[in-house]
């Protein structure tokens, strides 16, 4: 089993608190609205706090799959949200899980900066570039889609 990591960051015009709320507390409602492939987000275990497991169902080219998203930690005071993708038909077969440690920092002009550390826990000793790049693209797409929703809905 190997562990492969990368870090990324994304600037946003949206303030920390507002974007954090959209990316965490309200994400179950927002994400299916802004990402066409996501059909549903449902809690299958827990109450929304650490330990909660969500089933995220998506459709890609007529094929439906799902991932299990486990909340590892939420800290509203420091704008930190840690979670893992721990299973499901949408998790690449080469992976045991993917862990995410995210934090929103104060950014320029009232905005924020999203920082994320991603660790791929592989079943073998290799992580393909395709798997890593696809996960990175999906993460960036999700962040930008939720940010776009908040910017388009000023009364959010």
From Swiss-Prot:
Pfam families: Bet_v_1
Key words of the record: Allergen, Calcium, Cytoplasm, Hydrolase, Metal-binding, Nuclease, Pathogenesis-related protein, Plant defense
Amino acids binding trans-zeatin 3: 133, 136
UniProt key word Metal-binding: yes
UniProt: trans-zeatin 2 binding residues: 28, 54
Binding-site residues for trans-zeatin 1, renumbered to this chain: 8
Subcellular location(s) per record: Cytoplasm, Cytosol
Residues noted as binding Ca(2+) in the record, renumbered to the chain: 32, 38
GO molecular function, one term: signaling receptor activity
Keyword presence, Calcium: yes
EC number assigned by the record: 3.1.27.-
Annotated InterPro entries: Bet_v_I/MLP, Bet_v_I_allergen, Plant_def-hormone_signal, START-like_dom_sf
PROSITE patterns xrefs: PATHOGENESIS_BETVI (PS00451)
pH profile of the protein: Optimum pH is 6-8.
GO annotations of cellular component type: cytosol; nucleus
Tissues with expression: Ubiquitous, with higher levels in roots.
GO annotation terms (biological process): abscisic acid-activated signaling pathway; defense response
Stated role: Class II ribonuclease (RNase), with low activity on single-strand RNA. Binds to cytokinins. Interacts with melatonin.
Family stated for the protein in its record: Belongs to the BetVI family.
Record-given protein name: Protein LlR18B
Annotated source species: Lupinus luteus (European yellow lupine)
Encoding gene, per UniProt annotation: LLR18B
């Amino acid at each position: 089993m190997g562990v492969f990591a990368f870090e990324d960051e994304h600037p946003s015009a949206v303030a920390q608190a507002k974007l954090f709320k959209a990316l965490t507390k309200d994400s179950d409602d927002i994400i299916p609205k802004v990402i066409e492939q996501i059909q549903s987000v449902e809690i299958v275990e827990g109450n929304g706090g650490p330990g909660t497991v969500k089933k995220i169902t998506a459709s890609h080219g007529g094929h439906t799959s799902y991932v299990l998203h486990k909340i590892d930690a939420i800290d509203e005071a420091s704008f930190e949200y840690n979670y893992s993708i721990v299973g499901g038909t949408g998790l690449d077969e080469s992976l045991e899980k993917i862990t995410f440690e995210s934090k929103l920092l104060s950014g320029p002009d009232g905005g924020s900066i999203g920082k994320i550390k991603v660790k791929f826990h592989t079943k073998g000793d290799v992580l393909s570039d395709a798997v890593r790049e696809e996960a990175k693209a999906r993460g960036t797409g999700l962040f930008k889609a939720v940010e776009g929703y908040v910017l388009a809905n000023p009364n959010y």
